[in-house]
UniProtKB/Swiss-Prot annotation:
It is found in: Secreted. The lineage of its organism: Eukaryota, Metazoa, Spiralia, Lophotrochozoa, Mollusca. Expressed by the venom duct. Its main location: secreted. It comes from Californiconus californicus. This is Conotoxin Cal12.1p5. Residues 1-23 form a propeptide.
């Protein structure tokens, strides 16, 4: 059951919410309001919500940087 984003005409069709990410244990840890997962940290207030999924980042520009937990 992967969390994925599908794009149509450049717009995200589905984005998993922060609450759902935490519920599904996708985030390895939280550091200062950021999700740390597979070397990617994503701000909670990112434009379309959190960008972490089971493979790390869904869209690079949603992530301010990377950090291994």
């Amino acid at each position: 059951d992967l969390i994925t984003n599908s794009y149509t005409r450049g717009k995200p069709r589905h984005v998993t919410s922060w609450r759902n990410l935490k519920t599904r244990d996708v985030c390895d840890s939280l550091v200062e309001g950021r999700c740390i997962h597979n070397g990617c940290y994503c701000d909670r207030s990112a434009p379309h919500g959190n960008c972490c999924h089971t493979d790390g980042c869904t869209v690079a520009f949603w992530c301010p940087g990377t950090k291994w937990d």
